[in-house]
A protein has these predicted regions:
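GST-like domain detector, emphasizing the conserved glutathione-binding G-site
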Residues: 1-133, 137
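GST-like fold's C-terminal all-alpha helical module
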Residues: 2, 103-204
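Short beta-strand edge/turn micro-motifs at domain boundaries
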Residues: 25, 205-206
């Protein structure tokens, strides 16, 4: 089956979900036209954007058949099919299963926890969405445990889900690096996590 071709990516490079896609594309060496969307100015909520994209979020990928893809992992899945190597989502079925398992664990247990803390405790976001500061602090209280889960997974391993970098590592990196924004340090003693983080930061694709 011939895949539709990418037209442009609606982007905000420093936002977590777009950054996942941007790292993924950089690892694959894929260049694409980008349209930078100013979230703080509310450009993602403008009528023209909503009419085209359908939801007030980034990233969003426009394809030449008119399709719009708005979920970051789905965008990565498309580009994995378009350019299978270097492979980051699994070649054989069981490898795909393990990678997706860890991608979802990292996304729902760590990435989402960091995001909830940020979205509900950062005063600059109050104009963009309803906040519940208590819920933000509940999630902050979960972070050390979630980071500990990742540290244990990395015992004796270079990468989270396979023998190479995968989308699970990309999701984890974006979550861990966002800890700086919410002023939450990595606890002492998480040596496996810190070694992995140094390895990830050494990759050109992850440069901010």
């Amino acid at each position: 089956m011939t895949l539709p071709q990418p037209v442009r990516l609606y982007d905000q490079p420093r936002a977590p979900n777009p950054r996942r896609v941007n790292i993924f594309l950089a690892e694959k060496g894929i260049e694409i036209e980008r349209v930078n969307i100013d979230l703080m100015a509310g450009e993602h909520k403008e009528p023209d954007y909503l009419a085209k994209i359908g939801v007030a979020q980034v990233p969003a990928l426009e394809l030449d058949d008119g399709a719009i893809v708005t979920e970051s992992v789905a965008i990565c899945r498309y580009f994995e099919a378009l350019r299978p190597e270097p492979n980051m989502m699994g070649r054989e079925v069981m490898e795909q299963v393990i990678i997706e398992n860890w991608q979802r664990l990292v996304e729902f247990r760590l990435f989402a926890t960091v995001a909830a803390c940020f979205r509900h405790t950062n005063p600059h976001l109050a104009a963009l969405e309803d906040q519940c500061p208590d819920w933000g602090e509940v999630n902050r209280g979960r972070l050390d445990g979630r980071l500990g889960e990742l540290d244990r997974r990395l015992e004796g391993r270079d990468w989270i889900a396979a023998d190479r970098l995968t989308i699970a590592d990309i999701t984890a990196l974006v979550a861990v690096e966002f800890l700086r924004i919410i002023k939450h340090p990595i606890p002492d003693g998480y040596a496996n996590l810190l070694t992995w983080l140094e390895r990830m930061r050494a990759r050109p694709s992850t440069a901010l």
